[in-house]
Amino acid sequence: MKKYTFSFLLFVMSMLLVQAEQLHINPKTGNDNNSGTRAQPLKTVMEAARRVNLNKEPEATTIFLSEGIHLLTQTVVFNNDKYTLKNRLVIRADVMPDDAEWTPQKMPVVVTVAPLEPGVGGEEAKGIQPEVSHVTIKGLRFTGSPDYSYMDGTNLRRSYPIWRDGKNLDDLLITQCLFTGNADVLPLHVGVIANGYGLVIDHCVFFNCKIPVVFWKNNGETGSRSAMRYSLVYGGYFCGVWTTQGTDGDNFDFHHNIIASTSTVWIREKGSKNRYKASDCIFTDYNKLAGYGSGPLSDSDATATDFLEMKNVQTTGTIKIEKDQSKRNYLQLADGSIGSNLMAGLFKH
């Protein structure tokens, strides 16, 4: 009798362990009429989002993206706000940067070609829009959009690969992702822009992006800590990080980051009096260390740096980037570059 009882308990436990939604996407072999298993993958992220939004079961969700080019022909909105700190919505690569078999070619490439919509100061296209709390996005490569950014003297076309609008939302972790742009042909206006709380940028690389990340507005209540850590910003043609009056310096961590060959290192929302701390970082080859900004069309007005308490921050030296596409560290720090001790970049181990 004990044997059968034990077997039954094992069966129940195994059923509980698999109570999680998993969907696989392969842009080459997938079909949006498939079941979404690894053997029968979906074709588009849009279809995965549709299914996730319909599933009201209180369970975690993991969406696996295979290598290849994933075109977002419309904004992908996740609005099924059922997740918890433990049971998360995870959007991830099949193979992660720390896996032995990983190479840069294994990264799923997410390209936003969604129709532009009217926005403040021009038109904007949004890629992945998680309007839920407790989300992780990891191991993906995002590119700029093939838009002609200039409209006229007062308007721009802008792309946002990751956008979160809800000012009450919390806990958005972006980790081991690569954001690549080009000011002339594939402009990437902001890699990650998020209202709410708990935006964490971890082990990410931003290469030739106008603005890597904007820690945006919230509803004035309390939430989990926001952070930018172990990340590499190179060639930011506006700034390295943007904080607003809603970005509470006492609830914000900034450490082990490299910001190089960038116009302005740190932009604050115009009028902000918030103070911040930066530790164990390198800021080098910049035009201005700090400035104020007021919107997508504004230039930055240089400001004093007394708002920023810097501990063990290096401001000299040359950052070298690996440009050989055959190398595992492509678009990351080249071997022998200063800053290698900071572990900034895609690899955690």
Question: What is the role of each PLM region?
Answer:
Residues 83-150, 183, 315-319, 323:
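Right-handed parallel beta-helix/beta-spiral solenoid domain characteristic of secreted/periplasmic
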Residues 117-229, 234:
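Right-handed parallel beta-helix
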Residues 46-56, 71-82, 127, 268-271:
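Short, T/G/N/S-enriched strand-turn elements that build extracellular solenoid repeat scaffolds
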Residues 271-349:
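Acidic, glycine- and Ser/Thr-rich low-complexity intrinsically disordered tracts
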Residues 21, 61, 74, 87-89, ...:
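The right-handed parallel beta-helix/beta-solenoid scaffold, focusing on the short coil/turn
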Residues 72-73, 94, 99, 144-146, ...:
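Surface-exposed loop/turn segments connecting beta-strands in extracellular beta-rich domains
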Residues 27-66, 334-349:
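Acidic Gly/Asp/Thr-rich repetitive segments characteristic of extracellular carbohydrate-active
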Residues 65, 91, 136-137, 169-174, ...:
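All-beta strand scaffolds that present successive hydrophobic residues in beta-strands
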